């Protein structure tokens, strides 16, 4: 049985995993790998700390919903209508860095390494944004992701939003298929040489739908 509920702080490790997986998509290395230059365990711990930071960034636990299958965490995503949560990212990363003993010199390199992401960002003003979608491999193709997305669309509708949007790495066909199954359609894509050189995907594709 699939149950969808709001995330809680104690879900932090799973939410961090979802954020890490979403940033990696279909690739072997994602934004966190490139920025942090650590192994997977290091990146996952950093991501976990982002979700429970005081700074309410787009990684914060309070923005997430999770889907459980018979009481087991299976999928997560976050959604928001206020893009100011993106601007809290540096503060959240600073908190995570301090907590992991990362010195200021190393932390200063994070945005230099990760700035390529800005080249391909696109957004529709006033739309509800869905981010950090992650589903455990054993639950992919079972309807869990669709149930979670449908729940998020309803949440956005109740909040008064008329449109929702979601972006992902170009080439992540599995994600695109899942999003199209709940009514999302192509809206825009951006490509940039520096983006592809850094991560191996030509850019980001954005889908949108009315709600």
Q: Across the structure, where does each feature detected by a protein language model lie?
A:
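A short beta-loop-alpha structural element at the N-terminal edge
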Residues: 3-17, 25-30, 82
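Conserved catalytic-core motifs of GNAT/GCN5-like acyltransferases
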Residues: 83-84, 167, 185-200
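Active-site rim helix/loop that mediates acceptor-substrate recognition in acyltransferases
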Residues: 37-64, 68-69, 115-120
């Amino acid at each position: 049985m699939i149950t969808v509920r709001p995330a809680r702080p104690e879900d932090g490790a799973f939410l961090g995993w979802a954020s890490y997986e979403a940033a990696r998509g279909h690739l072997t290395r994602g934004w966190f790998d490139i920025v942090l230059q650590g192994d997977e365990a290091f990146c996952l711990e950093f991501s976990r700390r982002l979700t429970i930071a005081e700074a309410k960034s787009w990684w914060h636990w309070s923005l997430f919903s999770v889907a459980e299958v018979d009481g087991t965490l299976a999928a997560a995503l976050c959604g928001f209508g206020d893009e100011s949560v993106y601007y809290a990212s540096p503060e959240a990363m600073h908190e995570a860095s301090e907590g992991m003993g990362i010195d200021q010199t190393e932390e200063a390199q994070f945005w230099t390494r990760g700035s390529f992401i800005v080249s391909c960002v696109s957004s529709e003003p006033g739309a509800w944004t869905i981010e950090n979608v992650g589903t455990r491999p054993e639950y992919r193709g079972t309807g869990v992701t669709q149930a979670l997305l449908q729940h998020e669309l309803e949440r956005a509708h109740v909040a008064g939003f008329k449109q929702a949007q979601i972006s992902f790495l170009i080439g992540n066909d599995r994600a695109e298929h899942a999003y199209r199954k709940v009514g999302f359609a192509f809206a825009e894509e951006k490509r940039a040489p520096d983006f592809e050189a850094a991560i191996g995907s030509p850019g980001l594709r954005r889908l949108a739908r009315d709600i």
